[in-house]
Structure formats: structure tokens, C-alpha cells
Curated annotation (Swiss-Prot):
Its EC number is 2.8.2.-. The keyword Zinc-finger does not apply. This is Cytosolic sulfotransferase 3. GO terms for molecular function: sulfotransferase activity.
Length: 314
């Protein structure tokens, strides 16, 4: 769904400009205007993309949509999904070097043939306008709020050719805490998909970044079963899971030439999407006070929901 979001402010229609004038508006951490639409905040050009998507996307029953809040493991989940379906297309793997993940970035592997793979950062209620009653499947990946924030900070700094600018981090932190940030508030975003996964367990799968890190085999099998392409006992015995996990590991993906030199449709260099990918790295960048404040906010926002859920998820 990247093509729907790859717009400029000059692409705004008169209808969208009129809509924006009626919406709540705030300044983002980089000084760009944000407006609130259907409960979430968007840059004006992103809102145009959302509107275009809601009106123009034609879902197919076999579509797979990978969803996440930005910098929560989207690329990793995309790679795993591509690898799962690729093994069903080419089970023999006669030429492992011909695998599409070795010559393309996961963000660029959006097949036009069935099953089609898409990705989005919009919350579920906004996505649902486009998919309506389609049985297409949605896989959501959730990451610790603090790690996600730090990861977004790094890619913003890299995109601006700045080295770990603390001023930007502090601005992003304040924006996160207020909820006024692109695709935010964070807590509403994850709750939209979590609720959907409870209401539609056969259509929406809620996955957690931390759990994929601690139990990669179990989570990969869970993903494969949800997508309708479970591993056979023979595949498990011959190490198919290990092969996929190794190929889709961040160290392996980041070492590929295409991910060192290529660019995404919006001009961001693929290499900027890769960093450590570890759990708990926020401790190296956020102060203990910042971490405590985010934890306090998340507990407050999730107080009406299962304590077990947010302890495991966040």
C-alpha cells in the first residue's frame, strides 16, 4: 500500500483541503502539520493517501495485509511472510540464490499475483473501510513502545543525515506521550488490532515482536498456520524453519547488496531500515525517567484491558 502514501502536499485534492480545514490540527515534532482523521494523526499528504486507499483499494479474498505501527518489525514480518509463500511456490529450492529475498528488499516484494502482499501503518478501523467484508487476512505486529520510539528516532535522524540528535528524540518523546504523532496515538493503534484479533481470530492475527525474538520457531509455525500454509512434519524435520529464520534474520537481510544500496518508493534508503533489532535497546537512549513515563502512560491507557495482555505485549 506504499503507493497510496507516496504523495506530496501538491497532490491534495480540493475535497481533501476542505476536509482538512474541518479537522483538528497540530504541529508535529519536525514542524509539519498533522490533522486528526478517524481518531489518528496524519500529515496532509498521508491523509490524501489514506483517502485514496479507502476509496480505491479493491481487496481480493486471498490478499495478505501486514500491519504495524511504524518501526515495529514490519520489514521482518514481511520477509517471513514472503519466505513462507515462496516455499509453497518453489518447494524444491533447487537454486537458493534465486530466492526473491536475496535480490529484493521485503518492502519491494508486493506481488501482483495471488496471494498479494500489502503493508499498512493505518489503524484497523481505518483499514477496515477499504477491506470491508473481504475475508483477506491481516497480520499485525506489535513492539514495545519504547523500543519502537527509539527505532523511529534513528531512521528519522538517518533520513535527515543527523547523528543521534537528542533534540529530535526529546521532541518525538513529547509527541508520543501526547499522542499527537503520525499514525498515533500508539495505544489506540495497537488496541484497534488487538480487539480485531479477538473479534475476528480467523482474519486478524496479533503478533508480538518480543515473542518472535524469544520463540522464533513457535511464532513462525503460528504465522504459517494462520496464513494457510502450515509446515509439514517432513519440513520441520529437514530444517525448513531454520532456513527461513536464517534467511529472514536482520543480520542476513542487512548484509545483502540490495539492502545496502537500494531505495524504497518514497526515496528512503533501504539501509536506513536496518539497525540492531534487539529487545530493550531503548535503555541505551532514553533516560530512566522517560522510560517510566511511557510505561505509566501505557498502563493508564490500557487499564481497562487484560493485565496479562499488556504485560506480554508491551
Amino acid at each position: 500500500m506504499e503507493k497510496w502514501m507516496n504523495l506530496r502536499d501538491e497532490d491534495l485534492t480540493e475535497e481533501t483541503k476542505t476536509l482538512i480545514s474541518s479537522l483538528s490540527s497540530e504541529k508535529g515534532y519536525l514542524g509539519r502539520n498533522l490533522c486528526k482523521y478517524q481518531g489518528s494523526w496524519y500529515y496532509y499528504n498521508f491523509l490524501q493517501g489514506v483517502l485514496n486507499f479507502q476509496r480505491g483499494f479493491k481487496p481480493q479474498d486471498t490478499d495478505i495485509i501486514v500491519a504495524s505501527y511504524p518501526k515495529s518489525g514490519t520489514l521482518w514480518l514481511k520477509a517471513l511472510t514472503v519466505a513462507l509463500f515462496e516455499r509453497t511456490k518453489n518447494p524444491s529450492h533447487d537454486d537458493p540464490m534465486s530466492h526473491p529475498l536475496l535480490s529484493n528488499n521485503p518492502h519491494n516484494l508486493l506481488s501482483s499475483s495471488s496471494p498479494r502482499l500489502f503493508s499498512t501503518h493505518t489503524p484497523f478501523h481505518t483499514l477496515q473501510v477499504a477491506v470491508k467484508d473481504s475475508p483477506c487476512k491481516v497480520v499485525y505486529i506489535c513492539r514495545d513502545a519504547k523500543d519502537s520510539l527509539v527505532s523511529r528516532w534513528h531512521i528519522v535522524c538517518r533520513s535527515l543525515n543527523k547523528e543521534e540528535d537528542r533534540t529530535i528524540l526529546e521532541s518525538m518523546f513529547e509527541s508520543f506521550c501526547s499522542g499527537v504523532c503520525l499514525f498515533g496515538p500508539f495505544w489506540d493503534h495497537i488496541l484497534s488490532y488487538w480487539k480485531a484479533s479477538l473479534e475476528k481470530p480467523k482474519q486478524v492475527l496479533f503478533m508480538r515482536y518480543d515473542e518472535i525474538k524469544t520463540d522464533p520457531h513457535g511464532q513462525l509455525k503460528k504465522l504459517a498456520e494462520f496464513l494457510g500454509c502450515p509446515f509439514s512434519k517432513e519440513e520441520e524435520k529437514n530444517g525448513s524453519l531454520n532456513k527461513i529464520l536464517e534467511m529472514c534474520s536482520l543480520p542476513n537481510l542487512s548484509s545483502l547488496e540490495v539492502n545496502k544500496t537500494g531505495k524504497s518508493i518514497n526515496g528512503i534508503e533501504y539501509k536506513n531500515h536496518f539497525r540492531k533489532g534487539i529487545v530493550g535497546d531503548w535503555k541505551n537512549h532514553l533516560t530512566p525517567e522517560m522510560g517510566s513515563k511511557i510505561d505509566m502512560i501505557m498502563k493508564e491507557k490500557l487499564k481497562d484491558y487484560s493485565e496479562v495482555w499488556f504485560e506480554n505485549a508491551l
